[in-house]
Amino acid sequence: MNKNYNLSKIIFNDLISFYKTQLILIFMIFISALLIITIIHKTRLLTSQQEELDIIKKKQMPLNLEKYISTSRLKFKHEKIDT
């Protein structure tokens, strides 16, 4: 009369047979949470990369602006001489 029952197997079988929809919902919630976390992480990485690019562009802007101003002044001088 001394039978050994595997309690974890009994609980697992009961959960599958009686609480199938609840287990599916819990699994879907878990997957949804993981996807949200990965999307937020990737979005933050992209945002930080975009900010770094903006900083680099701002550092290069005065150089480009100076080149533009000097070339436009030269063009203006040439136009003055031509007329």
UniProtKB/Swiss-Prot annotation:
Topological domains annotated Cytoplasmic: 1-20
Compartment annotation: Cell membrane
Extracellular side: 42-83
Keywords attached to this entry: Cell cycle, Cell division, Cell membrane, Membrane, Transmembrane, Transmembrane helix
One Pfam family hit: FtsL
Family indicated by similarity: Belongs to the FtsL family.
The protein's name in its UniProt record: Cell division protein FtsL
Organism the protein comes from: Buchnera aphidicola subsp. Baizongia pistaciae (strain Bp)
Taxonomic placement: Bacteria, Pseudomonadati, Pseudomonadota, Gammaproteobacteria, Enterobacterales
Gene behind the chain: ftsL
